[in-house]
From Swiss-Prot:
The modification N6-(pyridoxal phosphate)lysine is found at residue 228. It comes from Botryotinia fuckeliana (strain B05.10). It comes from the Eukaryota. Keywords: Molybdenum cofactor biosynthesis, Pyridoxal phosphate, Transferase. Residues 648-812 form the MOSC domain. This is Molybdenum cofactor sulfurase. Its cofactor is pyridoxal 5'-phosphate. It catalyses: Mo-molybdopterin + L-cysteine + AH2 = thio-Mo-molybdopterin + L-alanine + A + H2O. One of its GO terms (molecular function) is molybdenum ion binding. Residues 625-670 are annotated as: Disordered. Its EC number is 2.8.1.9. Residues 628-640 have a biased composition (Basic residues). Belongs to the class-V pyridoxal-phosphate-dependent aminotransferase family. MOCOS subfamily.
Amino acid sequence: MEEYNKAVEEFRKHEYPMLKDAVYLDHAGTTLYSKSLMERYMGDMMSNLYGNPHSASTSSQLSTSRIENTRLNVLQFFNADPEDFDVVFVANATAGIKLVMDAFRCQEDGFLYGYHQDSHTSLVGVREDAVSSRCLDDDAVECWLSGSEALVRNEHNSEIGLFAYPAQSNLDGRRLPLSWPERVRNLSYEAQANTYTLLDASALVSTSPLDLSDVSKAPDFTVLSFYKIFGFPDLGALIVRKDSGAILQTRKYFGGGTVEVVVCLKEQWHAPKGQSLHENLEDGTLPFHNIMALEAAIDVHKSLYGSMECIANHTTFLARKLYEGLKSLQHANSEPACIIYSPGFSETSSNVQGPTIAFNVKNSFGAWVTNVEFERLASIKNYHIRTGGLCNPGGVASALELQPWETRRNFSAGLRCGGETDIYAGKITGVIRVSLGAMSTMSDVDSFLSFVNEFFVDHTVVSADEDGESQKSVDMYVESLTIYPIKSCGGFEIPKETAWEVRPEGLAWDREWCLIHQGTGQALSQKRYPRMALIKPTIDFDLGLLKLRYQGSTFPTLVDEISVSLSSDPSSYKNPNNIHSLSSRVCGDAIAAQTYFDHEINDFFSKILEAPCVLARFPAGGSGPSLRHAKAHMQKHQGPKRSAAIEKSSAHSFHDPPTPPDSDSENRKRPILLSNESPILAINRSSINMLNEEIAKSGGKLASASVFRGNIVLASTELTDSHHPYSEDHWSTLQIGSETYQMLGSCRRCHMICVDQDTAEKNEEPFVTLAKTRRFESKVFFGSHMCHVPSFSRHKKHQFPVIKVGDKVSIGL
């Protein structure tokens, strides 16, 4: 039954003076120690003489006696019979997990490992020592426990398994069934297998009881940290079910205090202690002062709060109020302010949700408020919370719908937990966590809700046109979108209705890879290797892969398809530690690109092009030789050209005059990847039509838009002065959909545009005709360079700029 403990309000000021002017909501990290505990501990230390428990003096024997008393108190705290359980003192829950892992990895055939997706990082890390491992969600666990599938794939004939999970998620407070250990034990008996259970009880026991009175239902191994319950001391425990303890004694390492005798000279032999499990597992001198503090902590905690059931009722009452309060916060336009990831509280059961709430905040336009912004303001106002990934990788990925390739991509882009950036590609990468403890009060909840309401809820309706985005369309639209993931190779036409991400470097995944000649270090291009046009890419977001096929004549032993991860996985490169990288040249720039070491990948390209080459990547976010900038600039032939119709049309689009060539905006360095001169290349369909009319007069082969390898083809339904052939020479800005783009200048052309992108055959057109009609100062131009202009709008759509086929286009002159 949920019940608020008013007594906490009466003693909190005296027992927790450190809370003055602070609202502490990070009890999942550690709860707070009471004044009474510290005074009692200090008095104990000042009144008694304690020696090292490995000695035989009276002071040492006193320490030993107090340690064993505390060990028994811990078992009683969890209703665990000392006949059935033993307590091993460790530094923290992570140390307990590692102790279990050390024993399991010593098994002759290794061990199989399954862990729940809500597991703390410390549980996830055990997989590195298992011969096979698997991350399971609720459904997968149920399938396994029902006998319909194995825990993990067993390719190593391992007979030992370990299943680990948290009793309560440290991320969002969700509680998992405590019935699983018994079901695992029953399943192991039926299958004549041997799978043990490891329960991470750290988050649960901070505010709720853990009852181990029924040994048949108890986990084999339970880990916890006492500072999460009492605030002090910094100590943990591994509670071992004695029937399962034999496997822990198979570990090879032994430390001081765990052996009866050791032989070093001439022979290597030792005799481990064997009277109890903990004697064999507690390496070195125990943190005996902390253990004595634990004895005091248990007593003081009971005197202040009564039972753990009372604390559970109190914190559940507060957590429900907090959850409902956050859920009810709405902006003036009725949009929710908080996106909550915790499961919440049902009317029939309060045992599915702990007093930990995970959420994020959105503004009234649906855009994410960054965790960094929220935490900074909270810190200034003296609210103590936690943000980020919370050391729960599976839980945060599930809550935020982050695919593995997205997480790896975010890492490659420089995103780190605790960093300044936590939104990438329109997705937030962390959460805000508030957690309650035994000494939390209703005033803490009310104060925090008021804080969120005051600073993150819009109480007046803000017009969607506040940024002056509404413009009159001039009847142009995006006809097609194409990216070229590998420089000079085939293009991937973006499907209609697919909103494609626009990055500072250009369209997502455009020209992020290249092929480098192993001898010269030069990036390959169609000028010398026209067959590159027939290497066709596909972006598979479901699998997180860039897939590549060759559509020309087949080569002996050539595989049909290869793929590389979209994420910048360091293990794929020749130098995974980025100590060295391959120096190359792209369009005259010296660059440092990371090369792939996979022979199948590199042989695929080398066979097709009949040249020794390697695939290399030049991902966004680099610096120094891993960073390039746009070179495009306005040409002399692109001076102002305005008719009356254009002047009228311009009045409804962009009001600012074109920037002079020496202005800051013109000279600003714009990042690019492996494109020749600019982030984005646009082609005007009416200009292609005009060009083909000229080619037809001489009987030449008409040009497809694909030979110009543009990212965007713009078309119009009406022929007006704003978008007649080559009118792009005089455009200053474009608004495509809701995003703004700045024109950077005309694109200079070479004879590579004569390569047919479907056959790889070379023709003289369209270069010959362009040389007659579009030559200025001995240079041939066709198409326009452009870049995206970031918006400072609070609107959701500007947090993740996109473009799609069919978008309307407005022109600024």
